[in-house]
Amino acid sequence: MIDIQKIRADFPILAQEINEKPLAYLDNAATSQKPKQVIEALTHYYEFDNANVHRGVHTLAARATDAYESARGKVAKFIHAREVAEIIFTRGTTSAINLVVDSYAEANIEAGDEIVISYLEHHSNLIPWQQLAKRKGAVLKYIELEEDGTISVEQAKKTIGEKTKIVALAHVSNVLGTITPMKEIAAIAHQFGAVILVDGAQAVPHMEVDVVDLDADFYAFSGHKMMAPTGIGALYGKRELLDAMEPTEFGGEMIDFVELYDSTWKELPWKFEAGTPIIGGAIALGAAIDYLAEVGLANIHAHEQALASYAIEEMSKIEGITIYGPKDASKRCGLVTFNLEGAHPHDIATILDEDGIAIRAGHHCAQPLMKWLGVSSTARASFYIYNTKEEIDALIDGLKLTKEYFGL
């Protein structure tokens, strides 16, 4: 069980009021709030250990390096990687996916090869593959969705085949919250000799992820969605794949030896981390992982699903509300995307903000999915470890007020 009030006390931002109303932050799929433990880890680094890593023998450099590499170890343990060297620090999910595209895919995709994604994908896991396919003359194929917006193993089997070289899918949809059967789809991909990349931006913060059990070849995620600062994320890759890949950025830190006309690279993971890394961000990510591990991801997932189930139940009672995705909360993570007939999503979000309720409105960086849903935009409420049933009640009251405001 989660002690919500104890957890909420760890998040300074939640104590404030917006428009003289208590802040109800329901925009966690966009970014998460930060507990004081993470903020303190970041400030401690800058107050006491600020130095560059791997490049000095003085005490500050040694402490900074130890903290930075310790964070890498925490990431590896958190997602159950085989070894620490398989964890590459990146700026976030987007840069992690682009690293795979620009290095692995650029070297291995040829004209006529097929890349399989889905209509669920965030633009960050669509545009890089789209542009690669255009450059290479490859074929981009989409797994059809079921009526409730889920990806089924059956549809994956129909799409993945002999010409498939890469499968790239979101573990959890940032719009519908649907959970992809990634382990089964990875097995299908591997039957045809394809590699699978998983966009885990919406999964790692909210549920247990075991990259070895999934048999993912690559797994990308961001820190800011799991209570760490912006600008830090990670890419997991199987060692044999990463070893064979060439760096895509060059400069200090990633080199082994430099001559006038040639250079050699460091071993994993550092050959992919050119320049001064995001040291403070990585250390803070480690602190966020400590926090999540202490609460327990199983507890977090159950809490969020309970909130989603309650939100769906209460929203369904409001005439004119359309909820997208499966109504069964066990098939999704803790977010609900919806529309109110007669009210634009941006108007809904604006009215809710007057009551201190923060949600997201727009296409959520998923325009192909919006087209599949038959809409241009939606409203989205997304939950996390610190959200409460009372905040869902406030959301429901705000939606009823929106109906009154527009005379619906």
Predicted regions and their residues:
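Pyridoxal 5′-phosphate
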Residues: 1-408
